[in-house]
C-alpha cells in the first residue's frame, strides 16, 4: 500500500515538473500594458541577435493570472532555435545531481518515517501469557463445590 502511495507521489511530482517546464505563468493587472519575452537565437553565421516578442493583453482578456504556453521562436527555415543557457555545464550537472539527491533523500526520509510509524514500541507489545495457566490470577479463593460436599 505504501509503495502505491510513493509511486503516486513520484508520478504527481513528475507531472508537475513537466507542466512547469512547458507552461509559463504571467501576472496581468489592469495597469499592465505588455509582457515582453526575450529569446536569444543564433543566426546562420553563428552570431547572436536578440529577438523581442511582446504580448499585449486586450481589455476583455485581462485577468489576475493567465497561463499560456510559450514556444521558442522559429527561424525563417521553420526550425526551432535552441535557447541559450545561463549556466555552464558543471553548474547544470551540479543542479541535476542536487535535484536527484533531494528527491532520493525525500523518498528515503518518507520510507524511514513510515517504518518508524509501523514499528511497535516495546511498551505497546503485550506480554505473552505465562505457561503456568493452572493457577488462577485472582486473589479471591473460590470454594470448590466438589470438596465441600464431603
From Swiss-Prot:
<comment type="subunit">
    <text>(Microbial infection) Interacts with Streptococcus gordonii hsa protein.</text>
</comment>
<keyword id="KW-0095">Blood group antigen</keyword>
<feature type="glycosylation site" description="O-linked (GalNAc...) threonine">
    <location>
        <position position="31"/>
    </location>
</feature>
<feature type="topological domain" description="Cytoplasmic">
    <location>
        <begin position="115"/>
        <end position="150"/>
    </location>
</feature>
<dbReference type="GO" id="GO:0005886">
    <property type="term" value="C:plasma membrane"/>
</dbReference>
<feature type="glycosylation site" description="O-linked (GalNAc...) threonine">
    <location>
        <position position="69"/>
    </location>
</feature>
<keyword id="KW-0325">Glycoprotein</keyword>
<feature type="glycosylation site" description="O-linked (GalNAc...) serine">
    <location>
        <position position="66"/>
    </location>
</feature>
<feature type="glycosylation site" description="O-linked (GalNAc...) threonine">
    <location>
        <position position="36"/>
    </location>
</feature>
<protein>
    <recommendedName>
        <fullName>Glycophorin-A</fullName>
    </recommendedName>
</protein>
<dbReference type="InterPro" id="IPR049535">
    <property type="entry name" value="GYPA_B"/>
</dbReference>
<feature type="glycosylation site" description="O-linked (GalNAc...) threonine">
    <location>
        <position position="23"/>
    </location>
</feature>
<dbReference type="InterPro" id="IPR001195">
    <property type="entry name" value="Glycophorin"/>
</dbReference>
<feature type="glycosylation site" description="O-linked (GalNAc...) serine">
    <location>
        <position position="63"/>
    </location>
</feature>
<feature type="glycosylation site" description="O-linked (GalNAc...) threonine">
    <location>
        <position position="29"/>
    </location>
</feature>
<feature type="modified residue" description="Phosphoserine">
    <location>
        <position position="148"/>
    </location>
</feature>
<feature type="glycosylation site" description="O-linked (GalNAc...) serine">
    <location>
        <position position="41"/>
    </location>
</feature>
<comment type="function">
    <text>Component of the ankyrin-1 complex, a multiprotein complex involved in the stability and shape of the erythrocyte membrane. Glycophorin A is the major intrinsic membrane protein of the erythrocyte. The N-terminal glycosylated segment, which lies outside the erythrocyte membrane, has MN blood group receptors. Appears to be important for the function of SLC4A1 and is required for high activity of SLC4A1. May be involved in translocation of SLC4A1 to the plasma membrane.</text>
</comment>
<feature type="glycosylation site" description="N-linked (GlcNAc...) asparagine">
    <location>
        <position position="45"/>
    </location>
</feature>
<feature type="glycosylation site" description="O-linked (GalNAc...) serine">
    <location>
        <position position="32"/>
    </location>
</feature>
<keyword id="KW-1183">Host cell receptor for virus entry</keyword>
<comment type="subunit">
    <text>Homodimer. Component of the ankyrin-1 complex in the erythrocyte, composed of ANK1, RHCE, RHAG, SLC4A1, EPB42, GYPA, GYPB and AQP1. Interacts with SLC4A1; a GYPA monomer is bound at each end of the SLC4A1 dimer forming a heterotetramer.</text>
</comment>
<feature type="transmembrane region" description="Helical">
    <location>
        <begin position="92"/>
        <end position="114"/>
    </location>
</feature>
<dbReference type="GO" id="GO:0005829">
    <property type="term" value="C:cytosol"/>
</dbReference>
<dbReference type="GO" id="GO:0001618">
    <property type="term" value="F:virus receptor activity"/>
</dbReference>
<keyword id="KW-0675">Receptor</keyword>
<feature type="glycosylation site" description="O-linked (GalNAc...) threonine">
    <location>
        <position position="52"/>
    </location>
</feature>
<dbReference type="GO" id="GO:0042802">
    <property type="term" value="F:identical protein binding"/>
</dbReference>
<dbReference type="GO" id="GO:0170014">
    <property type="term" value="C:ankyrin-1 complex"/>
</dbReference>
<feature type="glycosylation site" description="O-linked (GalNAc...) threonine">
    <location>
        <position position="56"/>
    </location>
</feature>
<comment type="function">
    <text>(Microbial infection) Appears to be a receptor for Hepatitis A virus (HAV).</text>
</comment>
<feature type="modified residue" description="Phosphothreonine">
    <location>
        <position position="133"/>
    </location>
</feature>
<feature type="signal peptide">
    <location>
        <begin position="1"/>
        <end position="19"/>
    </location>
</feature>
<feature type="glycosylation site" description="O-linked (GalNAc...) serine">
    <location>
        <position position="38"/>
    </location>
</feature>
<feature type="modified residue" description="Phosphoserine">
    <location>
        <position position="138"/>
    </location>
</feature>
<keyword id="KW-0597">Phosphoprotein</keyword>
<keyword id="KW-0812">Transmembrane</keyword>
<feature type="region of interest" description="Disordered">
    <location>
        <begin position="121"/>
        <end position="150"/>
    </location>
</feature>
<feature type="glycosylation site" description="O-linked (GalNAc...) serine">
    <location>
        <position position="21"/>
    </location>
</feature>
<feature type="glycosylation site" description="O-linked (GalNAc...) threonine">
    <location>
        <position position="44"/>
    </location>
</feature>
<keyword id="KW-1003">Cell membrane</keyword>
<feature type="glycosylation site" description="O-linked (GalNAc...) threonine">
    <location>
        <position position="22"/>
    </location>
</feature>
Amino acid at each position: 500500500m505504501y509503495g502505491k502511495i510513493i509511486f503516486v507521489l513520484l508520478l504527481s511530482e513528475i507531472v508537475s515538473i513537466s507542466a512547469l517546464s512547458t507552461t509559463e505563468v504571467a501576472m496581468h493587472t489592469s495597469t499592465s500594458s505588455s509582457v515582453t519575452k526575450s529569446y536569444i537565437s543564433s543566426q546562420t553565421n553563428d552570431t547572436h541577435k536578440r529577438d523581442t516578442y511582446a504580448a499585449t493583453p486586450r481589455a476583455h482578456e485581462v485577468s489576475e493570472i493567465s497561463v499560456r504556453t510559450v514556444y521558442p521562436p522559429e527561424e525563417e527555415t521553420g526550425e526551432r532555435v535552441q535557447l541559450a543557457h545561463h549556466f555552464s555545464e558543471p553548474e547544470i550537472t551540479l543542479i541535476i545531481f542536487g535535484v536527484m539527491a533531494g528527491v532520493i533523500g525525500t523518498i528515503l526520509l518518507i520510507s524511514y518515517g513510515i517504518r518508524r510509524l509501523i514499528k511497535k514500541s516495546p511498551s505497546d507489545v503485550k506480554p505473552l501469557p505465562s505457561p503456568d495457566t493452572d493457577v488462577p490470577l485472582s486473589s479471591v479463593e473460590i470454594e470448590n463445590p466438589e470438596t465441600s460436599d464431603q
